[in-house]
């Protein structure tokens, strides 16, 4: 298991503090999910980092930044935990997970905050279009981060900034598993 050291948690904590209103919104979202005592969290990357969306790095080098991992790659690290929260910005990940569970007749339950209009991230397109994120999108993102910190097992890719941030700010006994 990898945990953030108390010293590092102390040094990073002042870096980002939620306002009381923002924190209330996050708590409300987490509460509405009715998370069970035991659940796993999968951070599934899609979009530009795995070559599915426009990305300058891929155009220049011909390589993606990260390997694309499938739902089953995540699941094999915590098959005994029957409730899974999926963090993603691409609704297709949710659909793929539900199809896998159905096709394999598994008893797992999927929870998520991703909506059907979310189709993955493209940093290049976001810069070209001067995209900014709404408060609602930011609340959703940080709610996902707080949910991840509550999980028994967090499965993701250590090359992701999201993985690094969660691991370095987590103060619970969450087990971290990296696929890369």
Predicted regions and their residues:
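Short, flexible loop segments at the rims of nucleotide/cofactor-binding pockets, characterized by
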Residues: 61-64, 131-135
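Short secondary-structure boundary/capping segments
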Residues: 56-60, 100-103, 171-173
């Amino acid at each position: 298991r990898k945990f953030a050291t108390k010293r590092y948690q102390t040094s990073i904590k002042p870096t980002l503090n939620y306002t009381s209103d923002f924190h209330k919104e996050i708590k409300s979202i987490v509460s509405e999910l009715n998370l069970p005592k035991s659940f796993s969290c999968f951070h599934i990357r899609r979009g530009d980092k795995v070559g599915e969306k426009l990305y300058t790095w891929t155009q220049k080098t011909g390589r993606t930044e990260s390997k694309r991992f499938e739902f089953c790659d995540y699941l094999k690290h915590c098959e005994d935990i029957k409730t899974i929260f999926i963090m993603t910005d691409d609704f297709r990940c949710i659909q793929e997970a539900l199809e896998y569970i159905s096709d394999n007749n598994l008893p797992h339950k999927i929870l998520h905050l991703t909506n059907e209009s979310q189709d993955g991230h493209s940093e290049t397109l976001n810069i070209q279009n001067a995209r900014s994120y709404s408060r609602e999108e930011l609340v959703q993102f940080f709610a996902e981060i707080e949910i991840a910190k509550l999980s028994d097992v967090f499965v993701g890719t250590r090359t992701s900034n999201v993985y690094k941030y969660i691991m370095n700010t987590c103060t619970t006994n969450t087990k971290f598993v990296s696929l890369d």
